[in-house]
Amino acid sequence: MSRLLVTGFGPFPTVPDNPSGRLARRLAASPHLRRILGATPDCLVLDTRYGALDSELAPALARRPEAVLMIGVAASRSRVCVETRGVNRVSRLFPDASGAVGRTLAFDPGGPTQRRSPAAAQVRVALRRAGLDAAASRDAGRYLCNASYYRVLGQGCPAVFLHIPMPPRTRRPKAGGRRRRPALDCWAAAFAEAARVLAVRGRARPSALNQAHSRWASFAS
């Protein structure tokens, strides 16, 4: 069983170089995060296709990660956003990387209208303590970010989706000036704290389930 799964996305129409995939790889390879977790997290950069939810995401979830930290890009956002829920809706206006659109307006016709992340508020606090002015968001979109989040939240393990804006270009400093730290580096450092929150919640979950099972067994006997 892997401790933590970190996901990002590959390119899609209008975003030929997706920073979320680069950030996911950078975070998963971070020595700091490995020290926090005591293990190397798994990393999955999803093809931005609806079919990848079954061909790529489902096998990763079948390995039963204890927690999932998901990253996507939202070019219209001005700061990092912590998504509090995934909704059972798909837009048919925006094709994926293969040119396909959602087949139905509901991602899961038999599923609930929304799934919430109990860990979102705690993750936002951790990000803000790490120096990021992270905002809470109730709208993960109607594209692959939302669809994948809705799917993962259905697994029951602690999971949070973080939307990042397009990172600004790092300009050369003026003579005598200091070079600004690249946005991806800043985000990776802060996201390690989000991963810490999820990992702690993930490790506590089996104990809680075992206690609940023991209480039920005692009651049934």
Give a label for each model feature.
Residues 146-152:
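A short, acidic, amphipathic alpha-helical segment used as a generic capping/interface helix at domain edges
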Residues 159:
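Glycine-rich phosphate/pyrophosphate-binding loops
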Residues 163-171:
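An accessory alpha-helical subdomain
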Residues 1-142, 153-156, 175-221:
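N-terminal catalytic or cofactor-binding beta/alpha core of small enzyme domains
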Residues 140-145, 166:
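Small/polar glycine-rich anion-binding or flexible loop at a beta-alpha turn
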